[in-house]
Amino acid sequence: MSNKSGDSKNTLYCSFCGKSQHEVRKLIAGPTVFICDECVELCMDIIREEHKTHLVKSRDGVPTPKEICKVLDDYVIGQFEAKRALSVAVHNHYKRLAHAAKSSDIEIAKSNILLIGPTGSGKTLLAQTLARILDVPFTMADATTLTEAGYVGEDVENIILKLLQSADYNVDRAQRGIVYIDEIDKISRKSDNPSITRDVSGEGVQQALLKLMEGTVASVPPQGGRKHPQQEFLQVDTTNMLFICGGAFAVWTRSFRRVARDRASASVQMCVLMTSVVLGAILQSVEPEDLLKFGLIPEFIGRLPVIAALNDLDESALIQILSKPKNALIKQYGRLFEMEGVKLTFTEDALAAIAKRAIERKTGARGLRSILESILLGTMFDLPGLEGVEEVVINRDVAENKAQPVYVYGKGKSEPAEQSA
């Protein structure tokens, strides 16, 4: 903890948050007031959000694809092709709703979306960000927990109940919401051959999701159906809901060599070297018949006409994810250290080492937090009991070999931290 001198008559305070000059990095003076760097950052965030809201509400409430993609860029690093496909699909979906409100002889069909990409590539974050910038209700479901109605597990109608709860039981808002179903590859048909055993968590779930995705009036029990059988049901129309499904389709990796050989027989290296570049190129070329071979039924594939592929995140993208987005992990931990009056600094080679560890673990962006937690655990344990520390520096040796970080004290003295017992 930094050594703070006692309050005196000369101590200055922020006029907005009340923090003293010793608790913040900078205190900017005005004619009769002071403002700290934290309040300045908060004001900038408010201005940015208002600017984004203004963009989203242009053109009668339907943002253009470029506007949607621009906002996604602030939260999601890379994945340009997927963001472009999503932006166009979402723009067309909500333009379709505005079109449906007018009298017309032409009825535009709904285009639900399938996101294909490895773990930690940003599928869930993209769906969450879309719902946030469009200001529509959002819910997320795990396909592995779903079963047909009447069997142990979660009924598909519970997805609509969660969306309704997200909309504070406003049925009209819920009917324009976004539903994200994760792990959709886990409900593939177990076998091509008929079986006397009913597939209640595979093909059965696909069949149950069909009507919801194409549009039906679902009877939703507001308190859950199994524990309160006597309650009144709410009628929710799913016709205007946008369904986004995501899956890693990990078992495809073994068959990608055969797919690559069929589609690029002249390139032997493509069949042999399963690099992230090759994998991404194959994912970009996935066709509905590939999904059929994987185990999704034709009717289900037909409800997902828009297919967007996400690539594996490389080292450069992971470094940007660590430091660039608004809620970047480095910024989050930096704020925790600021609460102790200490500045947290990561060197460039430390960020590169963290990104390499995430790639080796094959966890993508999802694994970055656990890596940072293991690196900073000892420091966060010791720091509250230390005096005079102004800065903690994490270098490559700390990130790779779990060495002790460098502590910078008030008079410019730097030394490695002592190993805690």
Swiss-Prot record:
A GO term from the CC aspect: HslUV protease complex
GO term, biological process aspect, one: cell division
Binding site residues for ATP: P118, T119, G120, S121, G122, K123, T124, L125
A GO term, aspect molecular function: ATP-dependent protein folding chaperone
Lineage: superkingdom: Bacteria
Binding site for Zn(2+): C14, C17, C36, C39
PROSITE patterns: CLPX_ZB
Pfam family, one: zf-C4_ClpX
PANTHER family according to UniProt: ATP-DEPENDENT CLP PROTEASE ATP-BINDING SUBUNIT CLPX-LIKE, MITOCHONDRIAL, ATP-DEPENDENT CLP PROTEASE ATP-BINDING SUBUNIT CLPX-LIKE, MITOCHONDRIAL-RELATED
Function: ATP-dependent specificity component of the Clp protease. It directs the protease to specific substrates. Can perform chaperone functions in the absence of ClpP.
Full protein name: ATP-dependent Clp protease ATP-binding subunit ClpX
